[in-house]
Every structure is written in C-alpha cells, then in structure tokens.
Amino acid sequence: MNIKIVCVGKLKEKYFKDGIAEYVKRMSRFAKVKIVQVPDEKAPEKLSPAEMEQVKEIEGKRILDKIKDKEYVYVTAIKGKERTSEAFAKELSDLTTYGHSDITFVIGGSLGTSDAVNKRADDLISFGKFTMPHQLMRLVLIEQIYRAFMINSGSPYHK
C-alpha cells in the first residue's frame, strides 16, 4: 500500500517533525508513506470572503497537481464524516481489498480546502468539530493511520 499525505505549508516545529517521523518509521512495515508539502499562499491577516476563496483556489491547484487519477483521496474537513478508529481501520482494509493501493490524504491550509479539492475527494474525513492548526493535524492524521494498521494487524497498541 502507498500512503501519501499532501499538506499545505512547511512544518517548522521540530517536535511535530519528530513525531511524524516516528510514525512514518513505524508504518514502514505496512506501507510506503510519502509526505508532500505544497507552498501556502501568503495572505494578509484580514481577508474578505472573496480573497479567502482566492487563496483556497491557489492552494487547491497546488494540491490537485500532486494527486493522480488512480488515487483514492480523503480530504480532512470539519464538515467531513466522523469515524471511530475501528471504523477507519476497516475502511482502509476494505479499500485495499477492493484494489485501492494508492491512498492520499489532503490537509488544507489555515483557510481549509477549495471546492475543487473537495470535489476531487472520494471522501471527506473529520476528526471532530474542533479547529486545529494544520501542523498538528498532520500528526493526528498520521497517528490515526498508524493506529488503523495496528488495529488491522491485531496489535495491542489500540486499547
């Protein structure tokens, strides 16, 4: 299985980098994991709704350029479907059973994802109604992917 995580912006904090690297290392026995960062669009603090959409569109084009047609795509979104860890693990298992070996997860920038990115998604996934920094979301997402692999392998990691 190939897991790709497409994220907007660079990760600067060492503690996030270290945590993500640890989970990527742990997952190497289950999947090849690739993290792709696309540049975030610089924008002033106060934006009009139209300017916000423009920023999301620019970042969205950068995201879509990194996604291939054959990839199954999850986009993280507050309005996405919430799942339990067990249900998510079953979904990943079912995807591979039905021939999806390339799975991509998208984490948008601070304003979210564009309509075009959301339309490209095969599924919108939510980790709750809380707003999180997108840097933290990377770590949360990768831990949940790892947890799914551990659930599917019968490991006691998930209690």
UniProtKB/Swiss-Prot annotation:
Gene3D superfamilies: 3.40.1280.10. It is found in: Cytoplasm. It holds the Pfam family SPOUT_MTase. InterPro entries: Alpha/beta_knot_MTases, RlmH-like, tRNA_m1G_MTases_N. It catalyses: pseudouridine(1915) in 23S rRNA + S-adenosyl-L-methionine = N(3)-methylpseudouridine(1915) in 23S rRNA + S-adenosyl-L-homocysteine + H(+). CDD domains: RlmH-like. The keyword Cytoplasm applies. One of its GO terms (cellular component) is cytoplasm. Its EC number is 2.1.1.177. SUPFAM superfamilies: alpha/beta knot (SSF75217). It is an enzyme of class 2 (transferase). Keywords: Cytoplasm, Methyltransferase, rRNA processing, S-adenosyl-L-methionine, Transferase. Belongs to the RNA methyltransferase RlmH family. NCBIfam families: PRK00103.1-3, tRNA_RlmH_YbeA. Homodimer. Specifically methylates the pseudouridine at position 1915 (m3Psi1915) in 23S rRNA. This is Ribosomal RNA large subunit methyltransferase H. It comes from Lactobacillus johnsonii (strain CNCM I-12250 / La1 / NCC 533). The gene is rlmH.
